[in-house]
């Protein structure tokens, strides 16, 4: 995870309808779906440089590095202009923005990503490095891999898919630009792909929903309900497709968590959620996250949830 360095705030009560719907899916999909809440669950900070992280660090960075303030006028969102006609399918005419969390080269640009940007209700770091498994598989590599799989699945159904980045930038994008890409694309849905960095024993996935936030440039009042629907659909299909249980340390067994401190959600004007696919610091979760077959299932679960949401 470490999409920011703050500890998640006190959890809010979930709407009964959302929790009930997910519980029904869980009962039919996987035993032991409702895990116990662990209030001690916290995010790790920056990724520890393991073997893969060290390899990433040795890669050459861009000769000219734009500052976070200049990032909105930087690179075009990846996939903004499809090079081939999309197939006709159930999602034809729909736009989905996929936001791969972090960037593999963020750790080479700590000065730039630590600069503060406006998130409407305050200021936060442009971006963070993300976490990694203990063996060094970086979250930023995981998020790109799953995002590519998800893009392919959605495009096969006719959706226009835009990535906020595709390992084609020296760092970032900053969290405010990530939100802006979704807004300017007039996305029907935005999904930010992540993996958590919590303590050993904390297992499972969770979906982060935007809280009702209004202040400065942030106003989520028009997307809270639709984002909750999107998140519940993704959570239910994620359980069904991957066989993974919802988080046992966040969300009270629902797989859903609401936060008002994330710029990527606060600044969104279109339905948006974050998906934390598992805990990279737990060996059992890490074994799943590093398995290509499981990552394909994770992408399929998200694609099915997005499609169910868009089809109503």
Q: What is each PLM-predicted segment?
A:
Residues 1-31:
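Sec-dependent bacterial lipoprotein signal peptides
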Residues 17-21, 31-95:
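N-terminal low-complexity, Pro/Thr-rich disordered segments
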Residues 22, 127-129, 136, 221-229:
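Glycine-rich, flexible loop segments associated with nucleotide phosphate handling
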Residues 34, 105-107, 244:
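Secretory-pathway/luminal and periplasmic proteins that interact with or process carbohydrate-rich
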Residues 84-178:
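Active-site histidine-acidic residue metal-binding/catalytic motifs
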Residues 142-312:
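Active-site-proximal helix/loop segments of hydrolytic enzymes
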């Amino acid at each position: 995870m470490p999409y920011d360095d703050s500890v998640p705030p006190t959890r809010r009560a979930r709407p009964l309808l959302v929790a009930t719907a997910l519980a029904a899916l869980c009962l039919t999909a996987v035993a032991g779906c409702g895990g116990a809440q662990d209030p001690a669950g916290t995010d790790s900070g920056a990724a520890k440089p393991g073997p893969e992280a060290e390899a990433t660090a040795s890669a050459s960075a861009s000769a000219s590095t734009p500052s976070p303030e200049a990032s909105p006028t930087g690179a075009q969102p990846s996939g903004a202009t499809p090079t081939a006609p999309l197939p006709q399918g159930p999602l034809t005419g729909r736009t989905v923005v996929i936001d791969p969390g972090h960037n593999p080269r963020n750790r080479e640009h700590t000065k730039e990503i630590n600069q503060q940007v406006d998130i409407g209700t305050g200021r936060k770091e442009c971006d963070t490095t993300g976490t990694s498994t203990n063996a060094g598989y970086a979250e930023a590599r995981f998020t790109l891999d799953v995002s590519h799989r998800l893009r392919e699945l959605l495009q096969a159904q006719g959706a226009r898919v835009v990535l906020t980045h595709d390992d084609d930038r020296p760092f970032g994008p900053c969290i405010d630009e990530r939100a802006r890409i979704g807004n300017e694309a007039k996305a029907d849905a935005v999904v930010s792909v992540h993996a958590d960095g919590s303590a050993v024993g904390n297992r499972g996935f969770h979906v982060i929903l935007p809280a009702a936030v209004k202040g400065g440039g942030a106003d989520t009042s028009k997307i809270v309900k639709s984002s909750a629907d999107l998140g519940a659909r993704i959570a239910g299909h994620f359980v069904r497709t991957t066989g993974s249980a919802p988080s046992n340390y966040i969300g009270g067994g629902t797989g859903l968590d609401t936060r008002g401190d994330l710029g990527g959600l606060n600044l969104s004007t279109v339905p948006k959620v974050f998906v934390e696919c598992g805990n990279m610091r737990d060996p059992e979760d890490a074994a799943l996250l590093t398995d290509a077959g499981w990552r394909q299932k994770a992408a399929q679960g998200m694609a099915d949830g997005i499609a169910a949401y868009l089809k109503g």
